């Protein structure tokens, strides 16, 4: 097995060595729950990486949204270039769940758009877990949803080895059984093609590398890897495992047993409806279920097969579904990032799913077994865990109560202090804020302003614009990608002030911000709790010149706790800096990193101009041309003809450049 090994030019500093040692010892000793309480900018991700290196366990890192998961995955890939770092989030670009509105007699069919790249990354994650031990998976709460039986997934895997006696047609049948499609023309992920004694398979977990199996009679003579686009042979394999193209793939034997049980449940349900004089519902459930059964018999699957997953898995009613957690070995390690947000999210998933399914079951659209195609309940989630580390600057009561060890990470490697907090009266707050904004902008820095209401945020934005301050408003209707673009523009200085409500909290790392203003800080509530205030204060902890202004007429209990905690941390940080002769330095962070979090993790860097691309690849222009040709074909295939034409123009310029060399 490859060892999990961190590659970094940095060594642990400040509180990091103590936190790494303390939590690693706890994991190896058998502590189930621990907390890493790390302030913003203290290098919690690096600490997590070093703990993983110390304990050498397959690891799941749980984040509360796709953007944060992508950002973490990117960082872990830099720390562990020799190991398998995977990304597992929901593969839906768009998802409209199946539902029934009884009041208007409206049935809403499930409608979804699946992101092929993310589906590939999900398959890559599960296959990595079954093939190796040096695995780190960064996931959203998608990991607590049903994923199919890992034992069945493993049993259906096709193992091919050089010199093996294997009937070619038998392999083709098995490929179809695990939901690969035969396609001689459009050779894409999850398909295979046959040309004489040569079988080409495009694994569901691969981007562009396919497998070529060459036969001599019934003997496998050669197994090679090739580029699916160019056909160029890129490697030789002695052995290859082909994992199913769907996590819900089921063997014929299990499918037949499952169909009989579905028919039995259907018969019972129809009789129940007839007994209650619900003839329409009885007819509906019979028609819909029989159609699904017919599809399963003919194709091996049906649309919405996940609703029958409990029966196909052979589980008892009410038992938890199989999830990504079941693909891990028993001794895996879980990090819950931003646990104060992530854990409540995990808690809330089951309730929302159950209420939606009530109508579908009660009105004859689904069998009662559909209830068991669901996310895990919180207690079920906890029962699957073995070693857990909660990671947060503001851990919740649940985390602190559960943890046998809380490791504090208050010292930042850069020497940065928690910001100074100034409390000012509400009267005249806008004029005072205007004056502070001008001073901050004059020094070349940016400003974050957080309000309590949407109307105030909008009015404030308009007011500052009228006062010739470049201001933008970040509201909840803005999607993730647009949000990251706005943050990038703030960092670049395209505007100076960003106004928001509850959007200036976790994951907003902007070193250019030197002032955070909190309006109506004395209004007790969720947005002004001590934990929320500490998170907002943390947004100013990346700049050595930063300060926080709270506008309030009274010091609330939440404000008092947040101010005291921040001052406690400042004292510890100042003493450490004095003892070690450290001068606080503003974090220097590449601006491109902010927007890269929204891309699929494996994407290659785009160049800002053709000249930059040529300069970066001057010795490999032919490779660059091949890359753009692949991009052009992909764009044309997706009917994005303007983009394809743009790539064509680039290719022509590159070829001209090549001829001049």
Curated annotation (Swiss-Prot):
One of its GO terms (cellular component) is excinuclease repair complex. Keywords: ATP-binding, Cytoplasm, DNA damage, DNA excision, DNA repair, Excision nuclease, Nucleotide-binding, SOS response. PROSITE patterns: HELICASE_ATP_BIND_1 (PS51192), HELICASE_CTER (PS51194), UVR (PS50151). ATP binds at residues 38-45. A motif (Beta-hairpin) lies at residues 91-114. Residues 622-657 form the UVR domain. Residues 429-595 form the Helicase C-terminal domain. One of its GO terms (molecular function) is ATP hydrolysis activity. It is found in: Cytoplasm. Residues 25-412 form the Helicase ATP-binding domain. GO terms for biological process: nucleotide-excision repair; SOS response. Pfam families: Helicase_C, ResIII, UVR, UvrB, UvrB_inter. It comes from the Bacteria. The UvrABC repair system catalyzes the recognition and processing of DNA lesions. A damage recognition complex composed of 2 UvrA and 2 UvrB subunits scans DNA for abnormalities. Upon binding of the UvrA(2)B(2) complex to a putative damaged site, the DNA wraps around one UvrB monomer. DNA wrap is dependent on ATP binding by UvrB and probably causes local melting of the DNA helix, facilitating insertion of UvrB beta-hairpin between the DNA strands. Then UvrB probes one DNA strand for the presence of a lesion. Belongs to the UvrB family. NCBIfam families: PRK05298.1, uvrb. This is UvrABC system protein B. It comes from Clostridium tetani (strain Massachusetts / E88). The gene is uvrB.
């Amino acid at each position: 097995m490859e060892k999990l090994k961190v590659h970094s030019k940095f060594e642990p500093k400040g509180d990091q060595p103590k936190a790494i040692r303390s939590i690693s010892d706890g994991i190896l000793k058998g502590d189930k729950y621990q907390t890493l309480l790390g302030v913003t900018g203290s290098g919690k991700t690096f600490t997590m990486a070093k703990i993983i290196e110390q304990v050498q366990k397959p690891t799941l890192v749980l984040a509360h949204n796709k953007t944060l998961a992508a950002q973490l995955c990117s960082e872990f890939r830099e720390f562990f270039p020799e190991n398998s770092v995977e990304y597992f989030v929901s593969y839906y670009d768009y998802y409209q769940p199946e539902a029934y509105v009884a009041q208007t007699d409206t049935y809403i069919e499930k409608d979804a758009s699946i992101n092929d790249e993310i589906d590939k990354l999900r398959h890559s994650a599960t296959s990595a877990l079954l093939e190796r031990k040096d695995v780190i998976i960064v996931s959203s709460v998608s990991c607590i949803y049903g994923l199919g039986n890992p034992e069945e997934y493993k049993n259906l895997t096709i193992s091919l080895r050089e010199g093996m006696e294997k009937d070619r047609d038998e392999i083709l049948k098995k490929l179809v059984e695990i939901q690969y499609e035969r396609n001689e023309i459009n050779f894409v992920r999850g398909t295979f093609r046959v040309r004489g004694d040569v079988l080409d398979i495009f694994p569901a977990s691969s981007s562009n590398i396919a497998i070529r199996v060459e036969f001599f009679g019934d003997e496998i003579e050669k197994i090679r890897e090739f580029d699916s686009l160019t056909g160029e042979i890129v490697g030789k394999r002695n052995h290859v495992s082909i994992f199913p193209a769907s996590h819900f793939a089921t063997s014929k034997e299990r499918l037949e047993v499952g169909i009989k049980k579905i028919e039995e449940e259907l018969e019972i349900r129809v009789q129940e409806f007839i007994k209650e004089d619900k003839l329409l519902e009885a007819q509906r459930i019979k028609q819909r279920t029989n159609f699904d059964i017919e599809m399963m018999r003919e194709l091996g699957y049906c649309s919405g097969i996940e609703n029958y997953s409990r029966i196909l898995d052979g589980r008892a009613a009410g038992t938890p579904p199989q999830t990504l957690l079941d693909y891990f070995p028993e001794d895996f390690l879980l990090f819950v990032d931003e646990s104060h947000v992530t854990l409540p999210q995990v808690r809330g998933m089951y309730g929302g799913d159950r209420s939606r399914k009530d109508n579908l079951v009660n009105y004859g659209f689904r069998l009662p077994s559909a209830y068991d195609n669901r996310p895990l309940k919180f207690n079920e989630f906890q029962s699957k865990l073995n070693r857990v580390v909660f990671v947060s600057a503001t851990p919740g009561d649940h985390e602190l109560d559960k943890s046998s060890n809380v490791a504090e990470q208050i010292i930042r490697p850069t020497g940065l202090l928690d910001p100074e907090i100034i409390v000012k009266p509400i009267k005249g707050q806008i004029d005072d804020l205007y004056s502070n904004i001008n001073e901050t902008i004059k020094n070349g820095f940016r400003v974050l302003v957080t309000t309590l209401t949407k109307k105030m945020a909008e009015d404030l934005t308009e007011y500052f614009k009228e006062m010739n301050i470049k201001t933008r408003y970040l509201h909840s209707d803005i999607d993730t990608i647009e949000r990251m673009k706005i943050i990038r523009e703030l960092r670049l200085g395209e505007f100076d002030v960003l106004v928001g409500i509850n959007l200036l909290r976790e994951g907003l790392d902007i070193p250019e911000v030197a002032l955070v203003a909190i309006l109506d800080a004395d209004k007790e509530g969720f947005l002004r709790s001590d934990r929320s205030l500490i998170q907002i204060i943390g947004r100013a902890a990346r700049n050595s010149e930063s300060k926080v202004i709270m506008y309030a007429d009274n010091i609330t209990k939440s404000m008092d706790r947040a101010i005291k905690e921040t001052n406690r941390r400042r004292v510890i940080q100042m003493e450490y800096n004095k003892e070690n002769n450290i001068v606080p330095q503003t974090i220097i962070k590449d601006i491109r990193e902010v927007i890269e979090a929204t891309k699929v993790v494996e994407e290659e860097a785009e160049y800002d101009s053709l000249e930059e691309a040529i300069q970066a690849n001057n010795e490999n222009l032919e490779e660059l041309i091949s890359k753009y040709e692949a991009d052009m074909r992909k764009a044309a295939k997706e009917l994005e003809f303007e983009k394809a034409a743009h790539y064509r123009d680039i290719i022509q310029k590159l070829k001209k450049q090549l001829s001049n060399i």
